[in-house]
Amino acid sequence: MKIRFAILAGLLVVGLLSGLPVQAQQAAGHVERQKGPASRSTAAVTIDLAEGGRIFVGDEIRTGPGARLQIRFDDESMLTLGENALITIDQFVYAPSGDSSQALAIAQGVFRFAAGQIGKLAPDNVALETPVAVVGIRGTVFLGGELTVGMPAGQPHYGF
């Protein structure tokens, strides 16, 4: 009798909890290309990234030593991060026929950003915050961070 009561009580609790609303993460984009270690963190969970992996609003993205990461957002904007970069996806809302906005906080590292549809449709609604400035979109492509370029003989190449 006690076992039957415990089982019924457990099933009741599971049934009640299953009715609670679960907040889904809002997708923002995916990993287009990756070289080296990179991860995304949300609250207390850290997940290693891989090509094709989804990126969500609220994610903190971190690249490791020697790493490069390219993120394609759902509006076709592209963010390329160099090694030891740290950014947060603060906001991403893409509605081709409505209000759209994108906000990224770049805490450290080298980055390159090419605006997508949000930058074309609502350039005032795209912002990238760095430790020393907030960048608003007036053009479409810019590079930030510290970068040293050498030009040895041969064909120059920066990227993957």
Describe these PLM feature segments.
Residues 24-160:
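Flexible, surface-exposed loop/linker segments and immediately adjacent secondary-structure boundaries
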Residues 8-18:
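Bacterial N-terminal signal peptides
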Residues 1-5:
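Positively charged n-region of N-terminal signal peptides that target proteins for export
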Residues 17-25:
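Bacterial Sec-dependent signal peptides at the C-terminal "C-region" and cleavage site
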